[in-house]
Amino acid sequence: MGLTSDEAKIIINTLGRNPTEAEWLIFEAEWSEHCSYKSSRAWIRLLPSKSPLVIRGSGLDAPIIRINNIAVTFKIESHNHPSAVDPYDGAATGVGGIVRDILTTGLRPIALLDNLHLGSLDNQRSLWLSRNIIKGISDYGNRIGVPVVGGETWFDESFNNNPIVLVTCIGAGDFKRVIWGEGKVGDLVLVVGNDTGRDGMLGSSFASRELSSSDDIGAVQVGNPLLEKLLIDALMELGERGLVKAIKDVGGGGLATALSELAHQLGLGIEVDLTNIRLRDELKPEEILVSESQERMIIVVDPSRLSYVEAVLRKYEVGFDLIGKLTNDGKFTAYYKGIKLIDLPLDLITNPPEPIRKYTEPVYLMRLRRIPPLPSVKFNEALIKVASSPNLASKEVIYTQYDYEVGVRTVIKPGRAGATVLRLLEEDGGDGKLGIAVKADSNPRYSYLNPFTGAANSLAKAYRNVASVGAKPIAAVDSINVGNPEKPDKYWYFVKTVEGLTWMGNALGIPFVGGKVSFYNEDSVTGASIKPVVAVAVLGVVNDYAKAIEGGLTGEGWLVIIGDTGPELGGSEFLHSVHGLVAGEPPEPKPLSEVKNANLVMQLINNGLAKAVMDVGVGGLAAALIKMSIIGGVGFTVDLSKAPLTQGLNDPVTVAFSETNARYIIETSNLKETVRIIEANGVPYGVLGESGGGIVQFKWGGLELASLSVDDLVSINDSLRGVI
């Protein structure tokens, strides 16, 4: 049993009796870290969550953001433990689960993003995990007709046995289509979708402890994307016709969690008969409760509309079971073949005790934060190593496995810019011009060296990416993935992460409208913990998606850097790929500069002065320029000494690879007007050089640092092809 002895005592004392076997399983599921957030909820309440655009924030399956007459929702989820045991099904069902969370709002899922944190490419098990995770996402996403339009892929040896698999889903539709979640006593409760089987048994409990072995494969769910597609279509019609009052995904914890949370959210009770549930396998009633078989949802309907609901479900060949009704007693009551199995107060089920966890900074960090003296390195050799490193290499071999254009909404495709841009259609309630941009970012090395700074920088990076295409950032969701919360030096990472997100969110004016916390990302045999993954997805609004800007050079302009560059190599890709180090203090977060510089970039884009824009992040100025060159197939000549430098910086290698925040590269054909606007905004800038031709050339004053053809650069950057 996944409950502590203290938790078991609380349950027995509150009930005044010993729970039944079925009741124990409900508590094990609902009081797990995965479902209850018992070790994190006190901290995540600190995150800023309010904005005039946020109609409903975190706490339910998915938030609601209003943009004029359009409702937009987005959410991020993790599927780490299942993907470590069965990578194909673990990743695939991660896609299915997040799509169903979006469906609970009544809005159509329109796009997916994946953030993958995978192990070393020279480790055979890690390579096997990576290939199957990517294939699982590809197969499921392609078959349900929801495009995978963007993402991020990190490689690090700490993810060899414990990959971090995150999926974000975006939904949109007319604001009038939103299903807010209502119900009254006597309303009927149905399970719709898949049959209930043995797969995913107590998966929530499995996800709330350290990984052990492949013996846990029975806790991994198995997906059916074709059924999910039918479920999407059926729920869209039910919502459009106003036949559904509330929807709840059957996810972690199975029916035990879904039914109890739904009734509690409605402020009512619920009574169900498990005898009525279709089974794929022969199951005990207790197993029916905690099975996490996929493609299942709970819907609440008015009794007078049941026949219409049944007709729609039959039309799409989606199975359904009428299992119960809402009551006024505030209890979860369940029967099986006439025997009462469950009689529990919902307030007890849904309010587990919150343990007070100790936290302390790991002693090894003091040593790691000092960068040792570095041997000298030739600029061109460093450039090639950084450009070919797995983290900066082209991810084309990954995203071309995904269908990213289905649905006719994708304006800026994967690999073309800092963020993906999607058009909102007139059927969504828009004017045919409105669009949204979205990007999710993380940096495990930053978060490992300093979780406060790492978290703040994850939000800042996603904020810059969204601004770089011309979108105004309006909201964020986060996914925090760390080790065992019972270990003070691991829980410290979580606490400092939340503090960093809170600080930066308040400073940028960005509300967090949802998120996910995943603990126990450790190998129980070795005790090794992952580098913390703090992924932040930022959503932005584009008033006219036709004005959104890609990152590829056109060869028709000057290259201008916006923002200061300082000597900030801590946690950088340069240190790791060239010197084999993860050390130093990550770049200082600069929220005031982030806001000021982002507003300037958006102004330049809206005024039609930017031909191409790329924010500066991992790999520094050199990496940003390389990306722009490869995307556009165009060369450039730049003088790095022309960048605005701070702290007496005069080393070309540091200037090229420093990862100082709040910086962008702009290509413009109207240098005079661009400079006028930049100077009017009081933002540091430098004119680095020009784009054009087929050669990439870096200089420092009159000294040539490196020169290579764009074709050679493309080959160097394509280092993952044939590997993953």
Swiss-Prot record:
Subcellular location: Cytoplasm
Coiled coil: none
Annotated substrate binding sites: S78, H79, N80, H81, R100, Q221, E292, S293, Q294, S518
Sites where the protein binds Mg(2+) 2: D101, D249
Pfam family, one: AIRS_C
Annotated binding of Mg(2+) 1, by residue: E77
Pathway assigned in UniProt: Purine metabolism; IMP biosynthesis via de novo pathway; 5-amino-1-(5-phospho-D-ribosyl)imidazole from N(2)-formyl-N(1)-(5-phospho-D-ribosyl)glycinamide: step 1/2
Annotated residues for binding of ATP: Y37, K75, D478, G515
The enzyme's E.C. designation: 6.3.5.3
Catalytic residues, chain numbering: H34, H79 (proton acceptor)
Keywords: ATP-binding, Cytoplasm, Ligase, Magnesium, Metal-binding, Nucleotide-binding, Purine biosynthesis
Reactions catalysed, as given in the entry: N(2)-formyl-N(1)-(5-phospho-beta-D-ribosyl)glycinamide + L-glutamine + ATP + H2O = 2-formamido-N(1)-(5-O-phospho-beta-D-ribosyl)acetamidine + L-glutamate + ADP + phosphate + H(+)
Protein family membership: Belongs to the FGAMS family.
Name of the protein: Phosphoribosylformylglycinamidine synthase subunit PurL
Species of the source: Caldivirga maquilingensis (strain ATCC 700844 / DSM 13496 / JCM 10307 / IC-167)
Taxonomic placement: Archaea, Thermoproteota, Thermoprotei, Thermoproteales, Thermoproteaceae
Gene: purL
